[in-house]
Amino acid sequence: MVKQQSKEEIALQLKSAVYLSVAKIVEAKLEDLNNDNAATTTTESNNKNNNNNMLIATPTFIAQLVELVYNQLINLGEDLELFCQHANRDIVEPSDLFMVTRKNPTLQQHLKDLLRQ
């Protein structure tokens, strides 16, 4: 028997997935930034000071970033749903996403290029 998930359970699963993705992205970006910082340091005395200049992301920062990303995803989903309903459709189409991104022509063009591929 298939168990129906409640909206709260689905939201919790989505938030968990967002947390994992955001945490991995932050970790990778910090590693890149710290490696770039270490590569620009040339003397040993600077290397000692460089360890003090390592960038870190606190759990609070990551949690707040997750909240921001999650809320943006919820807003995006609501906007897509509204554009779809306005066009009397039940299925979201690329044109709905282009309507959401209409104020960011660079992003819109990038999405159109991805669609053509």
Swiss-Prot record:
GO terms for cellular component: FANCM-MHF complex. Pfam families: CENP-S. CDD domains: HFD_CENP-S. GO terms for molecular function: chromatin binding; DNA binding; protein heterodimerization activity. GO terms for biological process: DNA repair; replication fork processing; resolution of meiotic recombination intermediates. The keyword S-adenosyl-L-methionine does not apply. InterPro entries: CENP-S/Mhf1, Histone-fold. Gene3D superfamilies: Histone, subunit A. It comes from the Eukaryota. Keywords: DNA damage, DNA repair, DNA-binding. The MHF histone-fold complex is a heterotetramer of 2 MHF1-MHF2 heterodimers. Together with MPH1/FANCM, forms the FANCM-MHF complex. Component of the inner kinetochore constitutive centromere-associated network (CCAN). dsDNA-binding component of a FANCM-MHF complex involved in DNA damage repair and genome maintenance. FANCM-MHF promotes gene conversion at blocked replication forks, probably by reversal of the stalled fork. Component of the kinetochore, a multiprotein complex that assembles on centromeric DNA and attaches chromosomes to spindle microtubules, mediating chromosome segregation and sister chromatid segregation during meiosis and mitosis. Component of the inner kinetochore constitutive centromere-associated network (CCAN), which serves as a structural platform for outer kinetochore assembly. Belongs to the TAF9 family. CENP-S/MHF1 subfamily. This is Inner kinetochore subunit MHF1. It comes from Candida albicans (strain SC5314 / ATCC MYA-2876). The gene is MHF1.
